[in-house]
Structures are given as C-alpha cells and as structure tokens.
C-alpha cells in the first residue's frame, strides 16, 4: 500500500506544478498599465494632476504617517494579483507563536509591566519575495515606471532605497482566521502596501501614529497595549487600495480575522540605507529561513532602536 502511495505522489506533484506554471504564464500576458488605475493616479506623468496627488498624500503622511490611495489597482489588477497570490499560497511560512512589540526575547531584568515583556499570540503567514517571478503581476506593479519614483516623492526622503532583502523586498501577507498580527513596529522605515483581498470579517488595520518618532516612548506603547490610549486609529482597507505608512515609528496591528477567506496584502518595502536586509532572528520568525546575506549584513542599520 505504501508502494502504490509513492507511485501516485509523483504524477500528482507534476500535475500540480504544471497547473501552477500555466497559471503564472497566463498572468504574465498582461501589463502593469492594465493593473494600475492610471486614470485616477497618473504616477508616470509629469503634470498638474500628479502634483496635486503628491500634495494630498504628503499632507496625510505629515498628519499621521499614513496615506491611502483608494482603488489604486483596477479590477483586473486586483484579480490578477489575487490569482498570483493563490498560486503560491502554499509557499507561505505560517507561524503561531508569542511575540512582543519589538520581536525580541523576554528580559527578566525589566519590570513585569514593561512593554518589552508583554507578549501576545501571533498567527500569520508571509509568502516570501522569492516566490514572485520577475514578469508576474506583483513585480510588474513593483517595477512599473513611475511607481517607485512616486513613492519616493510622496515620502520626501532624500535617502530612499528599495529593501535589498531577497526574501522581503516585495511579499504577500496571508492572514487566516485567528488573532491576526498583534501590535508591533516595522524594522523598515517606510512600508507601502496594496490591499488585495479581505477576510470575511475583521482584519482592520489599527495604528497609533508616530508614537516613537522622538524615542522609544514606552509609556504610550504601554497605553496602546492595555487599551487606554486615545491615539489609536482604525482603518478599513478595500481590495485595490494603496497605503503608504511609516511603520517604524507607528505602533500598529491587524485586528483578529474571521471566516474562511484569507486576507491578502502585498507589501513593498523601502529603507534609508542601501543594501539593507532583515536581522537574522526577525527574518527566521517571519519567513522560516535565513539566507547567507542575512548573516553577512547583520547589524547594518543607521538608527539605535532596540529592534
């Protein structure tokens, strides 16, 4: 019986691989111009409309570190990126553990109520960047002429580089029913995300704007964690929405999710230093593996925050 099981496994694998390959080839027949809503968001143009759009995004970022471009993707774009995410969803690294805001280990020398000692259940999945082919929909959007320049101009950062991490420069977060993603800070300074698919219920994006812009601000972090902060904003992102967010300074989370439909969000990461990659421990937590480059470049960061 075990012998026949081994024989049937190979044909099944080949059929699955062929189906996945055909789907990827089909997705590559379209272009980024069909995926991005260039009528409302002329990011590749040098005109008054683009200037007005930039001014609006900059105001939002200045106010609370978050800007949302509704319906940035076309309907066709949403469908293509969701289909691509579905085709590689089995490659997601699923993790179920307990983490603190900083993804660091417990430090028993600190007071018990210190936010560095507050740990929460985490259930989440990330599809690493090396699963998305160069000509696929996600990377077509990422590499579209004008996309990266628009993001840089919106953020108004003189030092702006695409994240060099081969597992994390552009990924898809796949969140299934459960606790979502608890409160945390991003290790990269600027995060750009595309909402692709919502869960059946829940999954709101919640954040406390810029609470550690001038320092760690442990007191306000504690208030967010215990539910007494008045700084928390709740945001409902719809499929196709583009979000620019300063996650290095703003504590944020994905609220608990409900239902069988996974929540897909594409994440594009940019940083202030060239050649930056994730810290080995954080990378292992999020993607289930590290590459030699993570060990070689460990510690390459300009700021002094604890994560």
Predicted regions and their residues:
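Fe(II)/2-oxoglutarate
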Residues: 1-63, 290-307
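A structural signal for well-ordered alpha-helical scaffolds and beta->alpha junctions
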Residues: 18, 54, 144-148, 189, ...
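Non-heme Fe(II)-dependent double-stranded beta-helix
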Residues: 29-52, 62, 71-146
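Short amphipathic
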Residues: 67-73, 236
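Structured loops at beta-to-helix junctions and adjacent beta-edge loops in soluble globular domains
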Residues: 72, 173-175, 195, 246-248, ...
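A generic secondary-structure signal for well-formed alpha-helical elements
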Residues: 89-93, 155-159, 274
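Catalytic core of non-heme Fe(II) oxygenases with the double-stranded beta-helix
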Residues: 134-139, 148-242
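Catalytic core of Fe(II)/2-oxoglutarate
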Residues: 206-307
